[in-house]
Amino acid sequence: ARTFQNIRLFEHMTVIENVMVGAHSRSYSALWGAFSGAVLHRPFAQPAVEKTMRDRAFELLDFMGLGKKMDEGAEDLAYGERRRLEIARALAIEPRLLLLDEPAAGMNPNETLELDEHIKRIRDRGVTIVLVEHDMNLVMGISDQITVLNFGEKIAEGPPSTVQSDPVVIEAYLGEEEVL
């Protein structure tokens, strides 16, 4: 599963319906059913399937700190909440690997700290996280292994402490040290 740098939600749907769309691929593959249901604003017509997906969606929303907002419109959420909703929807397909493309982009420090905790909890559930991110505090706090690219070329790889002190990484991202 993956999320995008620019948040992509179904604005006209509720918070829980957004997650249920993600769970749809795990329940049955009636693609037409998903689209026709959305058009009719009845996203999931089979009651037993809908209940199972709704229960799973609520569990994910609760896990991501959004359980109390399940019936609100996705467009009404704050920025950090919208990001967490997008991640909950990605988790609905029960991935073993989750690609997060700059999840902290545009977040304030409090939202980033909250995101950090949620990503760690996802990792603790056994989901491998591939993180593309420029917030180095977030990267260093979450990562077990880091690969650093400079203009598409790998310049370092290893645990955070090794990468953080690598002279090639420091030069690429901070510039050369000048001796006066």
Predicted regions mapped to residue ranges:
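Glycine-rich phosphate-binding loops of nucleotide-dependent enzymes
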Residues: 1-180
